[in-house]
């Protein structure tokens, strides 16, 4: 319970970190130069994605998992100091001066938040329980889906009534570039965050890698994300147009994820390194571009809201499709274990073994079949990521072709 509450509190704090950094950037750097800096921030995200699993694995293997949380304290303290002393609060339009306390609270859209959070929780529980804990036709799963649908409809109604004071203001979201960029990053975020979670599991279960080893084997994708993000940021700064990079991102990512579905236990390093580089290059090229798209079409006063919408879509896509991937993986593993290792009376028991323990905990006579079952269930999961990357092309093709050099924007010194 303490861990759950602690992670919830940490999640509340972390919710504004990425969008907050991008909002600070919007108030500090001209739009024409912003892609380069946004790419740099994206590269830091990739660097954190590299160092995080490696450090987490090292802490877990050699010290204690608690250091995965302790390490955030000094880093957070330095960040707080830097923002507090070096970034002055910029002037803002539509401030809450003169409003009563009740009116200020209403502007936070508490009703929308109260409705939306349980809607997402119901949807995630339904996706995680369906086919594993309970059959898809079980009344609990059906009820959760129904509750999620009803709550989402109520949320949409609240957003319509609140208009500019809504969590998702219709005036902003219904702009062509905003909703298409949000859909693009929703799909791509689901693919990328899901693969960051499940690719290491493939290395652990199929290639017998340790927690640290799987992080190292995942480096080709994450390093290429960093390099491509910086290159794309510089290219957009020089050329001005971001839409071609969004489209190329969808194409490369779909190809890369599609190739991972061909992996087998005997797949060589050239294949799993090369395919990860394709994925990373695609993700790095386009992952930051939706932010530039919405900042180009919106006025400076709306940029924080537009930026938050894109980051929100990315996070929501990751949360939903990690749950979907978990369902595909769990159901597939049970099915494939029954197929390849029929002598195991309870195939679902393999789920409790864990990817890092199968080599040590299972008898030698069943190990090849279990490894094949892990491989096939994980490649089925990679199909989800490939489909998401392919679906992101819909949003990519709808994003307007505009240049960051074609729109002078108000900027405040920082």
Regions picked out by a protein language model, each given a short descriptive name:
Residues 356-414:
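Transmembrane-helix exit segments and adjacent C-terminal regions of multi-pass membrane proteins
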Residues 111, 136-305, 399:
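Transmembrane core module of solute transporters
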Residues 1-111:
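Helix-loop-helix hairpins in multi-pass membrane proteins, especially solute transporters
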Residues 3, 55-63, 127, 203-204, ...:
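Interfacial helix-cap and linker-helix signal at transmembrane-aqueous boundaries
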Residues 44-57, 67, 272-349, 380-384, ...:
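Small-residue-rich alpha-helical segments with characteristic i,i+4
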Residues 10-11, 41-49, 53, 112, ...:
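Structural signature of transmembrane alpha-helices in multi-pass secondary transporters
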Residues 1-7, 64, 262-276, 332-336:
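Helix-loop junctions at membrane interfaces in 12-TM secondary transporters
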Residues 63-183:
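Hydrophobic transmembrane-helix bundles of small-molecule transporters
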